[in-house]
């Protein structure tokens, strides 16, 4: 199963990246995350808390290319695993394409898929929250033509 969201943000990739890698600031702008413990950087294991969920997610950050992409992975390979990628594509000096995609796999997936929430609305909220905050920062700093 794969869930994907894509949005164009009227802000530089560096602004978007700054939001995506500021663990302490996430709850301020992101309605889908109530807290992240740890630092969002290569090789780090995070503790992520989401509203309404009675568990803590512990993804490991990998594949980091600053202001371009990263991946968060959680679970056991071949058993049940989630891999979430974040990709930023600068479009000129004032716009950034953002794609977030999560792929679930493993032998246990068929058994647990009915217990998973509908990620579509969650991903849409995440992308819209990111867009709103990045564009607010860009307007405030004069880093956009909007």
Regions found by a protein language model. Name each.
Residues 4, 49, 114, 118:
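Conserved short-loop catalytic and cofactor-binding motifs
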Residues 103-146:
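A conserved amphipathic terminal alpha-helix motif
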Residues 6, 38-41, 85, 109, ...:
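Short capping/connector residues at structural and topological boundaries
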Residues 37, 49-97, 103-108, 132, ...:
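Hydrophobic-ligand binding "helix-grip"
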Residues 43-46:
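Secreted/surface-exposed cysteine- and glycine-rich disulfide frameworks
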Residues 1-37, 41, 146:
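Hydrophobic ligand-binding cavity/cleft-lining segments
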């Amino acid at each position: 199963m794969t869930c994907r969201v894509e949005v164009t943000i009227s802000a530089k990739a560096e602004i978007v990246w700054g939001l995506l890698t500021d663990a302490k600031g996430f709850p301020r702008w992101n309605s889908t995350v109530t807290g992240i413990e740890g630092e969002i950087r290569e090789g780090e294991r995070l503790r992520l808390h989401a509203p309404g969920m009675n568990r803590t997610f512990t993804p490991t950050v990998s594949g980091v290319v600053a202001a371009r992409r990263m991946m968060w992975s959680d679970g056991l390979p071949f058993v049940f695993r989630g891999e979430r990628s974040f990709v930023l594509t600068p479009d000129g000096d004032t716009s950034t394409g953002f794609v977030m995609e999560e792929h679930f796999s493993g032998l246990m997936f068929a058994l647990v898929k009915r217990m998973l929430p509908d990620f579509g609305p969650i991903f849409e909220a995440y992308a819209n929250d990111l867009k709103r905050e990045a564009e607010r920062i860009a307007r405030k700093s004069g880093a956009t033509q909007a």
